[in-house]
């Protein structure tokens, strides 16, 4: 039996996305909100809403005690964390279970394993899936021996290398080093940044992958020992190490033909080995980085639903949120091993930001909002708008500046591109400054049309006249 009432522990478009599926399944929903989000669409969409604190996320959407109080007050029997905020925090998952509710996501010990990049590397290695060559333990930066070891590893894997904070993400605590003379300084800098941003001073190093592509595999596992790969997503259109456009299937040339299909099969198998190693449960994404030769290396597991999950839904016809709910309720997944993947889907994240000024966030009001030539927040076979705002909303500096996701599907990649471009052409978000025009510039570019782009492409394109 599915849950009677689910508390959605998030905001914006993902909260609305979860609420929509719950409503279709006859599940009552509870929204939480900050003072800044009192009139937000996710609040009005839900059956109940509870104020959990003031605007800053640390005092509201990250306030575990306040959220647990809302859980108790409303009698919800399960918690869906969405993405971001508390979605991958094992302490929160444990607290939900201790409160007598179900956390709709992986087990706390799984969140611990994949929330630590060193542990995740060890899991991948033990599963026979290769991470990017580098150190398998944190570097002892405070000792001469530790620095010497780092230099030896760097010499072995070859320059340039990248120093990373173990607790880092989104490009924070990461620095490229081109020669030995820069290692010691980079180790200290990344360690200091990691400590300040993530309360974790540990660092490690990896080979720097030139012209990298970011490719990920959607996996789904249940409590009955089943694990499935639902295809790959290409996520290489990025700025500041964060995604703007995602698509499925990947248009990378090394995935074409019979050899490409074999490479995909190997990629899916590599992803499944990793999640099976820890007895994974629920939705997850195994992220890989590909070099210009098509060699694929494990990066990490995002132990939650991804922002870009709709592109997988569009090509498979599955509702991943529904699958999350069913798995969390103990149901056995249907056989998804050979689920048909049809056509091509592309998602664009629409942000309140200025691409001409380094993609700097641009908070402000949204007085006029027209989606897709007046079609509204459409949910059709070929087009979806996943929005967290309405006319009269205000993009505040307290949260991520994403306004919405627009997702298009077509029988072919060209058809999907055309559908997405038409949708964006007919979209007005005023007077806000957004990246919508830049997304259309990406869609029109020769590199994107050819599928010949990497993670540096968007920032290069933004500087073109």
Predicted regions and their residues:
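Short beta-strand/loop motifs in extracellular/secreted proteins, especially
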Residues: 161
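Post-transcriptional modification and biogenesis factors for structured RNAs
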Residues: 132
């Amino acid at each position: 039996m599915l849950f009677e009432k689910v508390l959605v522990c998030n905001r914006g478009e993902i909260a609305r996305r979860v609420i929509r599926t719950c409503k279709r399944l006859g599940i009552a929903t509870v929204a939480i909100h900050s003072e800044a989000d009192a009139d937000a669409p996710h609040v009005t969409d839900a059956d109940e809403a509870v104020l959990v604190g003031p605007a800053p996320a640390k005092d509201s959407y990250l306030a575990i005690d306040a959220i647990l109080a809302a859980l108790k007050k409303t009698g919800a029997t399960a918690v869906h964390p969405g993405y971001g905020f508390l979605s991958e925090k094992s302490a929160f998952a444990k607290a939900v279970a201790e409160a007598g509710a179900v956390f709709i996501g992986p087990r706390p010990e799984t969140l611990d394993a994949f929330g630590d990049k060193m542990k995740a590397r060890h899991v991948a290695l033990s599963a026979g899936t290769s991470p990017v060559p580098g150190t398998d333990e944190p570097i002892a930066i405070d000792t001469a021996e530790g620095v010497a070891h780092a230099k030896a590893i760097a010499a072995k894997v070859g320059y340039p290398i990248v120093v990373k904070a173990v607790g880092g993400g989104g490009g924070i605590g990461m620095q490229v080093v081109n020669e030995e003379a820069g290692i010691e300084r980079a180790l200290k800098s990344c360690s200091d940044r990691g400590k300040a941003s993530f309360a974790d001073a540990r660092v490690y190093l990896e080979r720097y992958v030139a012209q990298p592509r970011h490719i990920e595999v959607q996996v789904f596992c249940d409590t009955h020992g089943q694990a499935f790969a639902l295809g790959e997503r290409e996520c290489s259109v990025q700025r500041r190490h964060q995604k703007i456009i995602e698509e499925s299937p990947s248009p990378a040339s090394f995935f074409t033909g019979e050899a490409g299909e074999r490479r995909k099969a190997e990629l899916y198998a590599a992803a499944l080995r990793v999640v099976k190693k820890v007895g994974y449960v629920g939705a997850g994404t195994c992220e890989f980085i590909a070099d210009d030769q098509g060699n694929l290396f494990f990066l990490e597991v995002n132990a939650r639903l991804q922002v870009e999950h709709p592109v997988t839904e569009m090509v498979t016809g599955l509702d991943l949120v529904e699958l999350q709910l069913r798995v969390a309720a103990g149901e056995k997944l249907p056989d998804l091993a050979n689920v048909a993947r049809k056509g091509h889907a592309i998602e664009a994240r629409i942000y309140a930001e200025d691409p001409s000024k380094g993609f700097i966030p641009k908070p402000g009001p949204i007085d006029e909002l027209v989606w897709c030539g007046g079609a509204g927040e459409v949910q059709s076979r070929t087009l979806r708008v996943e929005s967290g705002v309405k006319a009269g909303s205000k993009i505040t500096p307290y949260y991520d500046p994403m306004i919405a996701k627009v997702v298009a599907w077509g029988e072919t990649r060209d058809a999907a591109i055309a559908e997405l471009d038409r949708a964006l052409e007919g979209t007005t978000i005023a007077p806000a400054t957004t990246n919508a025009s830049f997304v259309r510039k990406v869609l029109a570019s020769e590199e994107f049309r050819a599928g010949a782009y990497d993670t540096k492409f968007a920032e290069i394109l933004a500087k073109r006249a």
